[in-house]
Regions:
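SF2 helicase/translocase NTPase motor core
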Residues: 10-40, 44-47, 56-174
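Interdomain "pre-motor" coupling segment immediately N-terminal to P-loop NTPase/helicase cores
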Residues: 1-13
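The Walker A (P-loop) glycine that initiates the GxxxxGKT/S ATP-binding motif of P-loop NTPases
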Residues: 52
Length: 175
């Protein structure tokens, strides 16, 4: 309800997210205060950047926010776009350690395999930057409720094909 109020009325300071009071923070590790603040911010803003320093637990903060929004029924499917090198080591491992009750899949391999995974019933689907271009139509049709772009600097130039593809997906004009 408070999140809905924040979207309806523009307050000078946003109302506190219920995540800080009404969430159990699952996982092997309990969040630090700054991770709770980050999760609160992300759960209140439908479009947001997270510029926390390296090593501050941004991935877990994102996962807790997504899990909280899933618990509320506000989102169902999350697409994580990240470098190939951290699909397993960071994202899938952190999902297991933070939200072990959620399902996840690595979307990598042939176009056919990627399509099958994208069409699957997973809470979190993890794909690398270049994989997005291979199955952009299927990604659009999958109707992800939340898209997380890790290390968004890979999309900083509007002249690259990566940026153009993700822009089409996000602006509902993918053909």
């Amino acid at each position: 309800e408070m999140t809905y109020l924040n979207r309806l009325v523009r307050f000078k300071n946003p109302l506190p997210s219920p995540i800080t009071k009404h969430y159990d923070w699952p996982g092997l590790y309990k969040p630090f205060d700054h991770q709770q603040i980050t999760s609160e911010f992300l759960s209140l803003h439908p479009k947001a950047f997270c510029f926390n320093e390296a090593g501050t637990g941004k991935t877990s903060s994102v996962l807790w926010s997504a899990d909280y929004l899933m618990n509320l029924g506000l989102i169902k499917k999350v697409l994580v776009i990240c470098p190939l090198s951290i699909m397993h080591s960071a994202w899938q491992n952190d999902i297991f350690n933070t939200c072990m009750h959620r399902t996840s899949a690595i979307c990598h391999g042939s176009a056919t395999k990627r399509k099958t995974i994208i069409e699957g019933d997973f809470d979190f689907t993890i794909i690398n930057y270049d994989g997005v271009g291979i199955i952009k139509k299927e990604i659009k049709e999958a109707n992800f409720d939340l898209i997380v772009i890790d290390e968004a600097n890979a999309y900083k130039s509007t002249s690259t094909s990566r940026w153009k593809i993700i822009n089409k997906i996000l602006t509902d004009s993918c053909s």
